Design a protein with these regions (language model features):
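Thiol/selenol-based redox catalytic cores and closely related redox-interacting motifs
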Residues: 117-119, 123-205
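N-terminal "domain-start" segment that seeds a small globular fold
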Residues: 33-56
Length: 219
């Protein structure tokens, strides 16, 4: 084989091998990227005073993550949530409360005033975090992740407020049910002890139905 042909073949083999390694590395990086943000433990949020809190602090606990509001028709759910918290907290259950002002501007006021309102009116003891946005480009990354994991769960049409929400949202967007975004205050996400999102409940869901699933995850 002529020397020039030999070197050309060798160079071509090196080029092909290098390309192969590049593709392997790309596939590996893509695979690793897809595995990122698999659980809520990958996220850091801010408490009501602005301090960073890693959700790894809640590893091995069953969590209920809720976007809340203080001037909403569902605000009395704070009372039910507190009872749920008191009943199961010692068994490893935690409620993470994220006030949100995106729905009818029903969570006005500062983080501290919201906290004081909930303590005074409902005696809440579960953790409350800094007010967040849950939809849109500026949505908190945690809530973007939660939506990706569990889409709209549907209204309980037996609830008195459900027909009003259905009418309002369907007029705004006839296809709203097909989208995973948060529809209203007091949407709840249930997290297992591995940090995985296992269920989503809309604001109209009965708390006793949620409680049954919490009990199952605590076993």
């Amino acid at each position: 084989m002529p020397r020039r042909a030999f070197y050309y073949k060798k160079s071509e083999n090196v080029r092909v091998f290098t390309s192969f390694l590049y593709l392997c590395a790309h596939e590996l990086n893509t695979s690793i990227f897809k595995q990122e943000m698999k659980t809520i433990y990958d996220f850091t949020v801010k408490d009501r005073k602005g301090k960073d809190v890693s959700l790894k602090e809640y590893a091995n606990e069953v969590l209920l993550i809720v976007n809340t509001a203080t001037k909403c028709g569902f605000t009395p759910q704070y009372d039910e949530l507190e009872k749920l918290y008191e009943k199961y907290h010692a068994q490893g259950f935690e409620i993470l409360d994220f006030p949100c002002n995106q729905f009818g501007q029903q969570a006005p006021g500062t983080d501290e005033s919201i906290h004081e309102f909930c303590k005074l009116n409902f005696g809440t003891e579960f953790p409350r975090f800094k007010k967040v946005k849950v939809n849109g480009d500026d949505a908190d990354p945690l809530f973007k992740f939660l939506q990706e994991q569990k889409g709209f769960a549907g209204w309980d049409m037996n609830h008195s407020i459900a027909p009003l929400l259905e009418d309002m949202l369907s007029k705004s967007d006839p296809n709203y049910k097909e989208k995973p975004d948060i529809k209203w205050n007091f949407t709840k996400f249930l997290i297992n002890k591995k940090g995985q999102v296992v269920a989503r409940f809309e604001a109209t869901e009965k708390l006793e139905n949620i409680e049954a699933q919490i009990e199952e995850l605590l076993k």
